[in-house]
Structure formats: structure tokens, C-alpha cells
Amino acid sequence: EHLMFGGSVNIPDYDAPLQLAGGENNAWTNNDITNYYLTVPRQNVETGFWLESDRMLSLDFSERSLEVQRGVVMEEFKQRCLNQPYGDVGHLLRPLAYRVHPYQWPTIGKELSHIANATLEEVKDFFFRFYAPNNAVLAVTGNISFEEALHLTEKWFGPIPRREVPLRQLPPEPVQTEERRLVVERNVP
């Protein structure tokens, strides 16, 4: 998710043209989806389509961008999961609730080393496996007609090649038949 803001081959600084157009953006990820969103004034809606399609088509993968974003995500992990009381409760509860299903693993990683050891090749593999127009949902709201939104979608996303996206086959979680408990004791100041 974070690398999507590192720029593309054509647009090295994703935020600069968006901010010049009066827009803002953000994103979030959970186990099922990554949601990127942006808001632009009506007169600059095509800028939003251009920016989103460009990074889907030609994201710039570089070690520098990976290192910058790795640092950001590691700090996010520390802030949310390590540096506040009960910050790791999700990390502790997930494996209790799920034994087989991938929901047992936190999206951000189970530990800092998962972030620290991610390679550029792994990131590229994930991107080229899942990031394609035929594996995306585009929602457009505001003062824009359906016809214009469809036209801009076809104009900006139509030329991007489809990819063979693997079918998501998640293992079913077995029915829980027993109580699961975890007692955590810590020295809290």
C-alpha cells in the first residue's frame, strides 16, 4: 500500500500534482482489500483518474522507495502495536480466533522482522499478481454523471493490460468446538 505513494515512472511525486489540483488522498489495508481514495475538486476529476491509472500501469519500484516506506510502516507498527497499552491485542487474539484461515495473520505483519525483511522482488511479485484493472473496484461519487465517469474510466484504465489474477481460494476455518484462552501478564509502569 505505502509504495503506491512513492511515485511512478511518469510521475515521480504522486502527491505534487494531486495537491496542485486541490486534492488529497490516503489509503488503508485489511486482510481482504486495500482501499486507495482521493478527493479532488469537480473541475480536476480527470487528474484523479490520470494519477490512479498511471500508478497502476507504471509504478516505480526502487530500493530507495522501499526503504523509505519500510521505515514508515515500521514506525506505524511500533506506534500502533508496541508503544501503547493493549496495542498488540489484535496480534494476540487473531491466532486464537483463527487456526487455519489467513485472518490469523495481521495485515501489517506479525512482527517487525516481517516488514524489515520484505524484499523488492516480493513487493513486485505481489503488485504484478494483484494490481490490475480487472481486479479493482472503482467507485466515483460527487458531481459527475455516470456517463462521464464511464468515459474517464475507459480512457484512463482501458489501455492498462488485464492480468491473470489468481483465484482467491481461502481455506475454511473449522468450527470451533472448544474454549480458547490466552493469559498475558506484563510489567506495566
Predicted features along the sequence, with ranges:
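Non-catalytic beta-strand/loop surface segments
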Residues: 9-44, 80-135, 159-189
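Non-catalytic accessory/assembly modules
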Residues: 64-71, 84-92, 144, 151
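Short beta-strand-to-loop capping motifs
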Residues: 38-40, 140-144
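Bacterial peptidoglycan biogenesis and beta-lactam-recognition machinery
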Residues: 5-9, 57-62, 146-147, 156-165
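Short amphipathic alpha-helices in soluble, non-transmembrane regions
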Residues: 50-54, 150-157
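M16/insulysin-pitrilysin zinc metalloprotease superfamily fold
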Residues: 6-8, 39-70
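Divalent metal-coordination and catalytic microenvironments
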Residues: 36, 52, 73, 123, ...
